[in-house]
Structures are given as structure tokens and as C-alpha cells.
Amino acid sequence: MDDEPRITTHCIPMISKADIEAAYRNIQKDIVSTPLVYSQKLSHLCGCQVLLKLENFQMTGSFKDRGALNRLLSLSPEQRGKGVIAASAGNHAQAVAYHCQRLGIRSKIVMPMGTPLVKVVSTQGYGAEVILQGEMVDDAGELAIQLSKEEGLTFIHPFADPLIIAGQGTIGIEILKDELAKDLAAVLCPIGGGGLISGIATYLKETNPAVRVIGVEAYACPSMKASLLEGHPVRLGKTSSLADGIAIKMVGQINFEIAQKYVDEVVTVEENEIANAVLLLLEMEKIVAEGAGAVTLAALLNRKVALQSRKVLLVISGGNIDVNILGKIITRGLAMDGRIAQMTVRLKDFPGSLTAALEIIKGLQANILEVAHHRFESLAPFGYVDVSLTLETKGHAHIHEIQAALQGAGFLCEDQCRF
């Protein structure tokens, strides 16, 4: 945000392990100590021992509960009386709104125009006044800063605040005290503005420096990776990602400095890789993760890091995903796996042609989900008609087998899968 308070180590000291332990004492009774579980299926798939830290089990569905509560508990009676304001794509908004409601503090939240409806409605449900402004979190932040000055509200920064960072770092405490995390080699953590990874990295590196801390960003918005390459926070241009919770134009100064000191590596993942990771978590582990929450699995699955045969923990940072987006992800993921196929078959335009084609498909044990005639808009020559078929299939080899059988029977068949 162009007008955000510039938090640097010259005016505010770097946080320490002691700050994180103090934060844990403050918030422990009011946040969920989230499950840390071993995944046999994902371990087999990834070639290493995979642990999952499930922050989607927090009350508002993400790790943001921790930092938001720690920051709110620091407010003076006067600040509580006037209220707070925050800017967020959803998770920080919900966390601030929920804990403000619990603590009796008035809250106002500015969210980007494209924020998933589920996050907007949830934030309003916690009693916050929601204002939609701008295309990204940074844009919403400019209005939030302005309103904080005009109305005397305390601005609760989503990531560039030591108390927020210390709250997020309490995840590190829960990781290292869990017996499953003994001999842990690495922790993979999503990066947006950098609040989560800077907190976790501080605690882990000051407690057990041997544990590698690896950040994961969406390829579409690699703000931390770009900043580390340049040696200072870099502002990216307009962007969007399935991982909307980490689509941040610029990381915070304090977050950048902590990452420089403690983060071993930052990698990026593509949109299709994120979508596939969301689908695998849902299908294999029955875990609903948002795009930002699944980037860690996407990185491990696609061998972005060399951790074969090691014990690796993935922070699943949140599960607040729009149902419509989840539906699209499921469809796209099934198509990528060859479990849904869409093809166009050109038939002679007389009775029985479609039946003949469908009998071939039936014989190859594909399930027909949808049949659509294109009689009027078709470019087929006179005497022919194009029919689009959506099929449930058993993999890419099965799709090729169906296409070959149709072509062998004289049908022109074209793969039209565009999910």
C-alpha cells in the first residue's frame, strides 16, 4: 500500500522467540491448537514423510486468528472504544471481525472488489461493517489508512506488524512441541505479505536452526521472491491468482527483513498446480483448503524443493474457499487427470447415428455425463451434425481408446476439453 505506515527495524525492533512465547500466553485459551497429522497417502505420492499443520481448523478458517487476536489484546481502553479498521482479501478480515465481536470492539473492514462472496458474508456475519474497494488488498488498504485517520480508528495491518507476526509465529511453538515433528527436516509455508512465514521462521530458527524454512508463492504474484532477489521490498503490478489470499503486491519491510535472515528458500507454483493440490487434499485427505492454503502441497508435489525421503511439514494456512471456485477446481482437476473428457463427434444427420456412437462409448465403459447437439451453430457440412459429449473416463489412455474406437467406426472425433 503506497500510504501504509513504513514499519522498519529502525523504529520497531525485530521480533524474537520470547515475543512469540509471550503472544502464545496471551492467545492460547482463545485460539485452536490445530491438528498436526501425518498423511500416508501424500507421503507415498511425494516420496517423503508428509505432515500437515491444519490451520483451516481455526475458528474463522485460517491462521489469521492468531495474529489478529494478539494485536487486538494490545489495544488501550481508548483505542477499543473508538474501534478498529483493517484491509483484507478475507481471512484477516474475518479474524479481526470475529475477535472484535468477542471483545466488544467495533470493526470496519475494507475488502477488494473481487473478494470471494463466502469471505465477505462471513466477515459481515461477525458484525463488521464491510466496504468493497479496489482490485487488490493493497488498493483496499489505501482507503483503510485514509478512514483510520479520518475516523480515529486503529489500523490493524494484515502482516507488517510485530504483534501480528508474533501471533502467527505461535504455530511454530505448536509444531516443535508435537512428537510427530521430531527430526523435522523442513517446513513449507505460504507467503503473501510475509506475516506467517516471518513468525514461524523466527521461532523455528531461534529454537532449532537445523529445520529448513521454505516459502511458497503463486507464480502470478511472487512478491517475496522478487524482493529477495532485489535486496529490498519490490512492488508488483496488477495480478490475480487462485491463491487470492496471498495475491499481495508488496511484502512488508519487517517481514522482508526477517525472511532475509531466516528463510532458506522461496519457490513458486503455477495455477494448475495449485488447483491440483486443492483437489488432492479434498479427495485424499478430505481436507478443504483454499488456494493459498494448498500452495505448500503444490510445491512438494511438483518437486519444487529437494526433500525426498525427509520429514516435511506443510502449513495448510486456511480453508475459506468459494464453493463456485471449488467446483471449477474439481472439474479442472478431474480433466487434468483424464477423469472427465469433452469431445466433439461429427455424425451423419440421420436417425441412429448418435445411438451408434453412444453404443461404442458404452462398450468401453465410459459414463456419459452430457450430450449437446450443435445443429444450428455447427460448421459441419450439409448432411452432418456436430455433437459435444462430456464423459466420465478412467484416465488419458481411456480417452485415447474411446477416440480411436469412434474414428475406427468412421466418426470424426476431436478432443475439445477446455475445463
Predicted ranges, named:
Residues 1-11:
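Short, basic, low-complexity termini and linkers enriched in Ser/Thr/Gly/Pro
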Residues 10-419:
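PLP-dependent amino-acid enzyme catalytic core
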